[in-house]
From Swiss-Prot:
Alpha-D-glucose 6-phosphate binds at H277, E278, Q280, H283, K287, H491, R572, R576. This is Glycogen [starch] synthase. UDP-alpha-D-glucose binds at H191, R197, R317, E500, W502, G503. Residues 670-706 are annotated as: Disordered. GO terms for molecular function: alpha-1,4-glucan glucosyltransferase (UDP-glucose donor) activity. Allosteric activation by glucose-6-phosphate, and phosphorylation by a cAMP-dependent kinase. It comes from Neurospora crassa (strain ATCC 24698 / 74-OR23-1A / CBS 708.71 / DSM 1257 / FGSC 987). Interacts with glucogenin gnn; the interaction is direct. It comes from the Eukaryota.
Amino acid sequence: MAHDNREPREVKNHLLFEVATEVAHRVGGIYSVLKSKAPVTTAEYGDRYTLIGPLNHQSAAVEVEELEPSNPELKATIQAMRDRGIGILYGRWLIEGAPRVLLFDTKTAYGYMNEWKTDLWNVASIPSPDNDEETNEAIVFGYLVAWFLGEFVCHEKRKAVIAHFHEWLAGVALPLTKKRQIDVTTIFTTHATLLGRYLCAGSVDFYNNLQWFDVDAEAGKRGIYHRYCIERAAAHSCDVFTTVSHITAYESEHLLKRKPDGVLPNGLNVTKFSAMHEFQNLHQQNKEKIHDFVRGHFYGHYDFEPENTLYFFTAGRYEFRNKGVDMFIESLARLNHRLKTAGSKTTVVAFIIMPAQTTSLTVEALKGQAVIKSLRDTVDVIERGIGRRIFERSVKWHEGDPLPEEKELITSQDRVLLRRRLFAMKRHTLPPIVTHNMLNDHEDPILNQIRRVQLFNHPSDRVKIVFHPEFLSSANPVLPLDYDDFVRGTHLGVFASYYEPWGYTPAECTVMGVPSITTNLSGFGCYMEELIENSSDYGIYIVDRRSKGVDDSVNQLTQYMFEFTQKSRRQRINQRNRTERLSDLLDWKRMGMEYVKARQLALRRAYPTSFNGEEEEDFIPGVEQKISRPFSVPGSPRDRTGMMTPGDFASLQESHEGLSTEDYVAWKLPEEEDPEEYPFPLTLKQRTGPGSPLDSIQGLQLNGTR
């Protein structure tokens, strides 16, 4: 945080430190954010970008290559801390972009813990109970980061320094940086609020009562008051406060008592998922693997046709209410009733992929796959025998001889072998609803909800259900598919979340060309709703969970799924094409520009004299541009003359100047494979809206001109 009595630092070639507890250590979603964003950030900053996190020896051993710092100021800072007994690993993170990382061994600083806890109380009035190991780790890590930043700016006196913190676990350093007047400018991004996650997990009408919560009392009742204090202090101590979505910004304004300066949506490394023209073939290949599982799981009751079978799924952390699993199961029951009433021949197999406590795979699940494998092996043997006999009979054929008959081709031995396999497929029980033995079967919320709505995989049911309480893996003996391959093989992802600050699962569906259902309480759902008119035409269905009652929302979700079952195969193929072409909307090359704007705003606030003293309000506010529905239904989104932006960071002037595809502001959707098939251009609806402080710096250059 800069001060007027100090010489302004050089902002043009500023340094960037990004601080999080998941650097080179997978715990949750922030790891995915940092890893997927790294190529874009390193391309912009090069060796001026360093990630800071706590050292996890196990993951660092395989993810980090140790190096000597080339920057003399950084080298001097690290040495000064090592001289005081602090363990530090500096090196290259072995991911795309190869960013530099600085990892602190927090265990080497635990001797300072009591001193630092006392100081934290004196500085920020934040209590810290002894028995909360996660908070203890956050405090030690926070003090090490503040120590490092203070030491570093004493060595580096020329260049401006930006420190960007993610989540409360990395946020302890923020009030310390402000109190000590360390000459860095800071950004804090909350990916979800502590209190929001706790409140939503209970039976609370969260969003309609946000302004009425006594936040201190609610945090105290849940035993997280000290954590909430850290999060709130971080939000109020930073120069620029951001969240990952507008819905989380609304939540943060009421729970953390500061209105965010802007929104930094999560992007994806679209190249990782890119399959170009192959994605339809990949869908077919992986769908066939899911067919194999379904044949085994439902053996003895497999009376539905693969071509009339649709695969729906939901996946994520096991948060029964927050992830909307309760609504998904209830909607499946209503969908089952509607399909049976309509006399539909379509069968829906719904998968729930959520890791829970299990002991082993069920005997029934293993037996089903073994029975089908035996049947397939037997049929292969018989098939080869028939082929050989047809060939031998044909070689000896003379004019006037009859064609080979069935009795000559299938031997009595073949018939006995086949009859044995068919008798082995007899089943006197219904196919199981879960693939594993659960640790607490009778207390599991998902299983109890399935039992309540009586979705027991009965032959008359048009909706079947499979709960797979384990992460997917190609090494799984029952469902041998990695998650990405499984998603490609399905037809529809359903994520009816009640609390979802962003939502990577529907975003991943989009870039893989799989339609999805989300809600307007998820960050991703809000983002796409603002960006696209009639988003369902592009394979993104948005359920209203904010203004509708629970029953109405369930009915809306049921209606979306029912409408999807009525689509023809050709309509589903066209919709997948449109969905996949939205990938560029979610690429970090576009989303990353919001991070650029946040950093520029932080520099302007810390070093206003470097920007000719212009006020934030003097800059052009944002313009929101919407992608309209496609003229052709079914069809594909395309663009002949207009520009599209993933956020509200392009001005009207820029969008009419015909900026190229490579320009960071404007972009075009990929061209059609057959441009002549659809003669109409994609039109954009433009509507001006209030800008955020981040919008004000869109045309800003470092010398203060526009």
